[in-house]
Design a protein with these regions (language model features):
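Sequence-structural signature of the catalytic-core scaffold of metal-dependent phosphohydrolases
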Residues: 2-3, 8-65
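Active-site-flanking segments in enzyme catalytic domains
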Residues: 20, 40, 46-52, 64, ...
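N-terminal cationic leader/targeting segments used for protein routing and processing
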Residues: 3, 473-474
Length: 474
């Protein structure tokens, strides 16, 4: 409560008392694996004594590598212990949430802040925001499946490949299929080390231990909270309102709806890595092979950059990757209209495009150089301009890019009404009006057909009206 915060230093010193010797508390709780524990303790001690922990000297780089390997072993040990000893000491919680190992390494003021944050932490997985510990718990409980590995194999691909390769027997395969801890370990082995490092952002000096040197911004202001995530997701969806929809058949009302396509929204799962970092990662656009499942986006739990900008970047990546996934190997075949095929065609042949001025062509050329010739990166940058600027009424894109964006990432009705004053959009808006009218007419016909047959109209039809028009009342 706020009373304790008001008490300030007396409360702080009480917390510091509880945090004294955090490393011992953590290692005692971890229990059995004495070699790892002893070695980790020595390495942490050596790391604390360094004057420059980011040094590129060989011995320092080696120490960081050893600490990194041991940290992940320890994370696995501690996770397993929490299943058996539910009374988790606060330093252990701080380790699992934030990568905290030692009050002096963290800086005493930071340690107190982390303590208060860990104390107030609750499980938010029901609304799709996970600390990494809660993410592993969701996998352990079978609510989520492990992420794909670097060879794009999900857990079941992987164990079947092991069986085919003769590494495991049929009985072992069966056991692994339903072994929750094996699934957790798959995530710990494949996803965690990679993504923890990428989100941290400074790859060459990476070390997963929470350290005062990495806190380049006040912890409270960089803390990624559920309310910040929800607010930003809401802001993006107010502009690109169809970002997280998937085309689908209405399986729940298949007898009534038949082959009628509908669109369902799957908001991404947000996973927060135990570090202070600068990058977000769009880790998966779908779960395993199921298209109708949430994507996975990952941030540092303390994100030093502007969260909305990073989030918008990831949403652009998500749109690109999902379109590629849905289109398969025809993702860049322009005879089949899609976001990726039209954008690919635009960048590939921009020099010959009569709709672009010489100046616009020059801009594309220099942007492409800056994006190291990556079409995806070009798209993501245009997407960010679309959401952050054009959606706010400030045109920045060229005519061709704007048309592609308007077609595949349309604005909702209220923004379209605002843009109607601007002649740059008039042709696009006219075309959209026709398309929306056709879509709504189709749904009207469907609705009347159902009503005439005394069949209740599924609520998915109402939702589809919103998908088509971007209007809550159409």
């Amino acid at each position: 409560s706020n009373d304790s915060a008001e008490a300030g230093s007396s409360g702080d010193s009480e917390i510091l008392g509880k945090l004294a010797g955090s490393l011992n508390t953590i290692l005692d709780y971890a229990g059995s694996d004495l070699d790892t524990v002893t070695s980790f303790r020595q390495h942490v001690h050596a790391y604390k004594l360094l004057s420059d922990r980011a040094s590129q000297d060989q011995d320092v780089a080696l120490l960081r590598r050893q600490l990194t390997e041991e940290f992940y072993l320890l994370y696995s040990l501690l996770f397993t212990q929490t299943l058996e000893q539910p009374n988790i000491p606060m330093p252990v919680k701080m380790f699992l949430y934030f990568g905290y190992v030692d009050e002096e390494l963290a800086g005493l003021k930071n340690a107190v802040t982390l303590y208060r944050m860990a104390e107030a932490m609750s499980d938010h997985s029901d609304i799709g925001v996970y600390t990494f510990y809660d993410w592993l718990m969701a996998i352990f409980r079978g609510k989520k499946s492990p992420s794909r590995n670097e060879f794009d194999q999900d857990y079941s691909d992987y164990i079947h490949k092991q069986k085919v390769g003769g590494n495991i027997t049929d009985a072992e395969l069966k056991a692994l299929e339903n072994n929750p801890m094996a699934k957790v370990n798959y995530e710990l082995r494949n996803m965690f080390p990679q993504v923890n490092k990428i989100t941290f952002g400074r790859i060459t000096t990476f070390c997963p231990l929470f350290c005062a040197d990495d806190v380049l911004k006040d912890l409270e202001s960089s803390y990624v909270t559920v309310s910040r995530v929800s607010q930003i997701l809401e802001e993006i969806r107010r502009i690109d309102y169809t970002a997280f929809y998937r085309e689908s058949l209405d399986m729940e009302h298949i007898d009534v709806m038949g082959k009628e396509t509908i669109h369902l929204e799957y908001l991404p799962d947000i996973i927060l890595m135990p570090n202070v970092g600068i990058r977000g990662v769009m880790w998966q656009e779908i779960e395993g092979k199921r298209r109708n499942s949430p994507g996975r986006m990952v941030f540092s739990i303390f994100h030093l950059e502007d969260l909305k900008t990073t989030f918008t970047h990831l949403t652009g990546e998500f749109r690109w990757e999902l379109c590629k996934r849905v289109q398969g190997n025809r993702w860049n075949d322009v005879s089949i209209s899609s976001l990726t095929s039209e954008y690919f065609d635009y960048i590939q042949f921009y020099r010959k495009n009569h709709d672009l001025s010489t100046e616009a062509k020059e801009k594309v050329k220099s942007s492409l150089q800056r994006a190291k010739n990556s079409f995806k990166e070009m798209f993501v940058r245009d997407y960010m301009i679309w959401v952050l600027f054009e959606g706010a009424g400030s045109p920045r894109l060229n005519k061709v890019a704007r048309q592609i964006m308007f077609t595949y990432c349309p604005f909702p009705e209220d923004i379209c009404n605002t843009l109607a004053q601007n002649p740059l959009y008039s042709e696009l808006l006219d075309r959209r009006k026709i398309k929306v009218a056709q879509g709504l007419h189709h749904l009207d016909v469907l609705t009347r057909k159902l009503q005439n047959g005394n069949i209740p109209v599924p609520e998915t039809v109402e939702q589809e009206r919103y998908y088509i028009s971007g209007s809550k009342k159409s």
